[in-house]
């Protein structure tokens, strides 16, 4: 029995080797049988000439046969000496009856030549009847009749003398005469066998056996792999007892860990040992779970419901003591030598007897020897065992005496712990690392809950008492105002403080504009003002912000006044800069010598061309007329009037004092004069820069802005009048002081701005009358058109100067006196 139980742990390698060897032999057997099986037709054909030759050699009456057609044999070898005479052997075999011979004409003698037979063609579908071979003459004149059983009456080796070897002449003589050597008469009835198709059964059998052998080999390999993994898993589970479930660890204390521990465990699982016949004589070689604890003795329960072969009644073998005393019981043979036990058993025994172990704490298991632990259920593969916290190892008891193995004898008291064991505190023993729990994989902040949520779920009365938010203005309105409040980034306390003090610069222009977008209607203001918070309802955060603002008297009127204050100085500065630009443009047009010279030259050429150059009272040509003669071309169709004017002005402007000192001849420095004059003319656009800026200013808009600033001062006076009626003197006084100071400064700035406006208008009017003459009452709004015309003329002059500079580099100058001007717009020249 022990050998059979130990076989699964030790025999698998040998068993697998034998199984693989047998399968390999089965795999090679078909090939060996296919090689060893001969062909019946070939053997029959090859054996007939051999037997015939041997009979010819040992026959005394027959001559030797002709030589075989083999090219390698040239001369016949002498025959071996004859053997000793032996009695003839007769075969007592009853041969089958010969087939009936049909009388057919003999074939011609030419077919009996010694030449080798040609290869046989494949047999036709209908097999022809067998043709008997011709009867050749024997050594005597009269041939003897053929015998029905030629191979039975004559021995295989007759006792006759060997004939002499045939000569070359005899071999060359043709056969057919009576004296020539021929085949013996006893084989004259041989019939050449007909060719049959080869049989394919051995090849198919070999392939079939090979396929079956390969399937068996694969099946055995899979079985070997399965058994190997199973044994490895079992060995791993025994070597790591901490990975088991608590029930498996508690049951591991009753297993016998020795060399054949795996085999014993498998044997006990397959077949439990028989039950003891009586409990009066308990065996001392088995360990019962009742000895692990000493509960109060109770009457044994009935065991009529338990079968003898039940696993609950299976006794457990003694367990060895491992390492230091660990509180487990072992056999007497292994208790004296604790070093013989493997360390794996020590870990299993130390982790099994824990305070939470069910086998050690159940009082019903130790009441009777028949109550035994059921077999441990193995954990299913692929599922991790249930984790458990680290167990505390109990203090080991003293070694038990021989009589203590009786389950009915009480255990002696345990000895006090030693000093070495006291050094290891329970906290240090419990520091052993255990398997991580599923809760350890959670993030630290995932279990965090707010205090409000805890109160909401734990105290329902508190949650019921919380006020409910209401929205008086409606969800869309509150959403829009909430976006503005969020964009402000200012608390309602800061807004209230700035409005009460009138600090416009503290909030800023953007914040005041956003607050002005929250202006409410009278109905909405009344709803928010007369709403009172209670325990059941409260306003939403947006409406609470608006209510805090509306608590200030005339809040939105104050914000409007503060927005005017924040924008006042910015608008005043812009108006001052615009008026200053207009005044500078007027001064540039009056004081620019080069501009007047260009205008005078254009006026002279215009008069020569009979072009209306403006009103008769004007001192210069209108800017609009300058734009008309820009595209007038000369006789060659290339040079324009403005180009000729520029060329004529460039030469006198180029005679600077620096150039005159170095001018010895006019022809040498003529190009330099023109180049210098071109630079002077091209600077005209830079001298009239304010004129270009003034062309984009709308004087009518400037007048409206000054008027609006004066109207804004009236709003400030209205807010101060309303603020004086507020009962709260402190808040009203602060706002009144701030606004009163601003009013005094704003009135002074507006007066200065109005004076500057009048001066600017007079200058613009004077420049306009210089070009256009006296203006009527309806043309006062179009006085700034002169700046736009001058800007366009300067742009064309700048373009012509650039073209002249490029021509100077590429070719010579075209003189004005060589030009023939064409009359533009259908007019003729004088």
Swiss-Prot record:
Pfam families: FH2 (PF02181). The keyword Transmembrane helix applies. Residues 1-34 form the signal peptide. Residues 40-195, 235-446 are annotated as: Disordered. The chain crosses the membrane at residues 203-223. Residues 61-86, 95-135, 314-323 have a biased composition (Pro residues). Residues 424-446 have a biased composition (Basic and acidic residues). PROSITE patterns: FH2. It is a single-pass membrane protein. Residues 390-823 form the FH2 domain. Gene3D superfamilies: Formin, FH2 domain (1.20.58.2220). Keywords: Membrane, Signal, Transmembrane, Transmembrane helix. Belongs to the formin-like family. Class-I subfamily. This is Formin-like protein 14. It comes from Oryza sativa subsp. japonica (Rice). The gene is FH14.
